[in-house]
């Protein structure tokens, strides 16, 4: 059994994935890179929503940092979009196939109940520590677990970025200049999210911590 962090794709993302694989299976001459690009852009947006936006939404409405952190999330999304637009370019169909192979083999996973998820593999240690910490929060020990939450969700962020920003982009034909931009952007996003976690979590009362961790608990699964 392997552990994953995974969110349910939107109807638009799921339909785009299905259409792309139908075209590939039928050896259609239609351009695959158009679908790769749309899938990549939607995945980036929906991953950010799962990782950070839900955390911000868990804050009390009168939180003094909530509005600022919403802007921070928008900055991260803009940074990601800029990198994606830099990396993606018109590509021959045969050269796009490695990206779809990666998605098929390492991203698309089903829960034990058969629900499709856009997924990131987690080490057993990280997954079990996350679940144990979440259970403690749900048991009323949120304040005691704040530092563990900050540390573990920082590790989760890094795992997601490693999977999509580093591993996935290895399937793209990039020149040295474009490839050099990846670790720079990775570092920026990690730093911004780490700062956000350190500002957000200590502000959250027990009720908010329970709501926030319940959301993430449902995103960790094994198969």
Tell where the protein language model's regions lie, with residue ranges.
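Protein-protein interaction and targeting regions used for scaffolding, dimerization, and localization
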Residues: 2-223
């Amino acid at each position: 059994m392997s552990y994953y962090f995974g969110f349910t794709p939107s109807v638009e993302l799921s339909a785009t994935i299905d259409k792309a694989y139908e075209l590939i299976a039928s050896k259609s001459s239609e351009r695959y890179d158009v679908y790769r690009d749309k899938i990549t852009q939607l995945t980036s947006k929906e991953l950010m929503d799962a990782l950070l936006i839900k955390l911000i939404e868990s804050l009390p409405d009168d939180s003094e940092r909530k509005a600022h952190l919403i802007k921070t999330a928008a900055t991260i999304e803009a940074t990601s979009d800029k990198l994606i637009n830099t990396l993606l370019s018109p590509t021959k169909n045969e050269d796009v196939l490695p990206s779809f192979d990666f998605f098929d083999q390492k991203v698309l996973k089903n829960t034990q109940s058969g629900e499709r998820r856009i997924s990131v593999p987690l080490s057993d240690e990280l997954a079990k520590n996350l679940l144990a910490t979440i259970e403690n929060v749900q048991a009323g020990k949120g304040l005691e677990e704040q530092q563990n939450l900050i540390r573990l969700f920082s590790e989760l962020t890094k795992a997601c970025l490693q999977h999509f920003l580093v591993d996935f982009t290895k399937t793209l034909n990039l020149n040295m200049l474009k490839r050099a931009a990846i670790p720079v952007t990775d570092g920026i996003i990690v730093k911004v999210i780490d700062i956000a976690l350190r500002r957000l979590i200590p502000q959250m009362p027990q009720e908010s911590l329970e709501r926030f961790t319940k959301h993430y608990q449902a995103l960790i699964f094994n198969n």
